Amino acid sequence: MSASDLTSVQAGAPQGRRQILVTSALPYANGQIHIGHLVEYIQTDIWVRTMRMHGHEIYYIGADDTHGTPVMLRAEQEGVSPKQLIERVWREHKRDFDSFGVSFDNFYTTDSDENRVLSETIYLALKEAGFIAEREIEQAYDPVRQMFLPDRFIKGECPKCHAKDQYGDSCEVCGTTYQPTDLIHPYSVVSGAAPVRKTSTHYFFRLSDPRCEAFLREWVSGLAQPEATNKMREWLGEAGEAKLADWDISRDAPYFGFEIPGAPGKYFYVWLDAPVGYYASFKNLCQRRGLDFDAWIRKDSTTEQYHFIGKDILYFHTLFWPAMLEFSGHRTPTNVFAHGFLTVDGAKMSKSRGTFITAQSYIDTGLNPEWLRYYFAAKLNATMEDIDLNLEDFQARVNSDLVGKYVNIASRAAGFLLKRFDGRVQASAMNHPLLATLRGAIPQIAAHYEAREYGRALRQTMELADAVNGYVDSAKPWELAKDPANAVALHETCSVSLEAFRLLSLALKPVLPRVAQGVEAFLGIAPLTWADAGTPLSPEQPVRAYQHLMTRVDPKQIDALLAANRGSLQGTAAAAEAGAANGNGAGSKNGKGAKAAAQPAASAANADDGASPIISIDDFAKIDLRIAKIVACQAVEGSDKLLQLTLDVGEERTRNVFSGIKSAYRPEQLVGKLTVMVANLAPRKMKFGLSEGMVLAASAADEKAEPGLYILEPHSGAKPGMRVK
């Protein structure tokens, strides 16, 4: 169903009962769930709840991704078996998902009999169809532990920016991708020994087969997100270009996973059996509920299948996975929905670096999970844009929207209705024009949710809440209650308020399911569905005593959350200041220290051994620092360092500035951003043109030891041309 189709969906209208299978990416079973993970599970859960409220047959499936070298080594470090480790982690993950209201129909494990059988079946079907190749490859080998090393188990010095302790496939500092053999001074993270090269027989899925390319070109054209389609087309290349490489689907013993049939000592690579785990989890559910599993996965199935994932695993879900399914005789996904990454107060989260806020720490500090569900939903849309958890904004938005605008409507009306009118609404009040407006908006809000435009759904809902509060403030029930002669008007006001509250609760139910349960109990009504928009409260059913549905965020709770994750967040700040690229070139100036996380950390820039000379305030006043908006940005042909920025500085014309930040940013990342520039720097004639100023960037003092480069961004509200003083 396209986005345009979704907007025509009418809440409660007969759409036909759809059969839908939905998955989120499988969390890896060697670590904790953090709030970055929760973006995806909350996004998926809201969509699933939306579809359940339409009455569709929908199943939300998940599992722990349990196989691979990291799990094997983690278990060894803990002195337990891999199976013991994954069983414990499963319980922890299930606890966290339950805490945040993630309503899986089945949360399973990829280390299951169902998954082994399905993985073998798919592999053998691909082999029979000629899609499996066998060849010798050379790999890194740990001579001490006598094991082949995955790329992420080799570290060394980045060949480009020379950052230390970088992984064997990509640099977390400058973003460069490379082969493990490109690392300078590589070492095994398992034993510390220098890896040697050794050959082994491996098995490959022939993604380069012309049949795969032809199928994938057609399949990716149907993806819902244009940016996903464009990225896949980049990887596919032009017709005849043959950019797709065969995919290594095997690993050597020792390895925790499923052994490949007919290949002793060889195991399925985790990325083969992990997506099959979606089907394995669903098969387990089907066996328990008596559902026809084959009817959902066979090639001619009329059911729908959607995968919600992070944009970092698009490659696996839009190339490997659909090709595996197509050529093993199964149905392919209806669509794949990718989301962006989460930052916390502007800093990128990194699980491998331990820089994340755990789900459990959020719960342990007494924060309401539905606050986070609401905040994430307010920022989510149907694109792959990154979202930021700004903790000050989080507190302000929850307190203003959920407490100030929403639950206070019920608290203001319920007392009068119970005390004066036996808890029963006025029947004639259910026809009030304000309620007609709310009922008319419900179908559009439901359509926004289905189109994954959660931010739009919540903005519309809060606009309606503003209208309801305006009505209450105008009617002044607290004044009406002072005079018995106003009883009819008071009854109408309270009745309209509570019916409006019911409708707002309906609009918010996919996001706030536990609050919705409380509302349903308070109003004495059945679980709300979209079809209930036109079924108002009845005088025959008195409301119950009002119980507080939600409290305000206490700043002390935020402080406790930061304290619980202080080491992690300081690591984020340190990583940001130890950053990415070398050499700033003309038009870019290093500043000292850049706030990168919610929790302050010792700045690398503050450790500068060579102190800058002291200047007077008059010296500083000579520098005209201005807010600038980057309206255009492009790479400079012939330069590996420079980007050409077109800046709006609030003047009648734009300015042209060359900045040496190409190693840290792609042009499209900068367009639309605000930054800070030196506006009164003398223009400089360069090889590539005239540079009319300088943008500011932060980096560490010793750029070779701690490379990194970060442009400065002002807070929202700053405008082009404003002076920085």
From Swiss-Prot:
A motif ('HIGH' region) lies at residues 27-37. The keyword Zinc applies. Pfam families: Anticodon_3 (PF19303), tRNA-synt_1g (PF09334), tRNA_bind (PF01588). Its cofactor is Zn(2+). Is required not only for elongation of protein synthesis but also for the initiation of all mRNA translation through initiator tRNA(fMet) aminoacylation. Homodimer. It catalyses: tRNA(Met) + L-methionine + ATP = L-methionyl-tRNA(Met) + AMP + diphosphate. Belongs to the class-I aminoacyl-tRNA synthetase family. MetG type 1 subfamily. It is an enzyme of class 6 (ligase). It is found in: Cytoplasm. SUPFAM superfamilies: Anticodon-binding domain of a subclass of class I aminoacyl-tRNA synthetases, Methionyl-tRNA synthetase (MetRS), Zn-domain, Nucleic acid-binding proteins, Nucleotidylyl transferase. Its main location: cytoplasm. Its EC number is 6.1.1.10. InterPro entries: aa-tRNA-synth_I_CS, Anticodon_Met, Met-tRNA-synth_bsu_C, Met-tRNA_ligase_1, Met-tRNA_synth, Methionyl/Leucyl_tRNA_Synth, MetRS_core, MetRS_Zn. Binds 1 zinc ion per subunit. One of its GO terms (molecular function) is tRNA binding. GO terms for biological process: methionyl-tRNA aminoacylation. GO terms for cellular component: cytosol. The gene is metG. It comes from the Bacteria. This is Methionine--tRNA ligase. A motif ('KMSKS' region) lies at residues 348-352. ATP binds at K351.
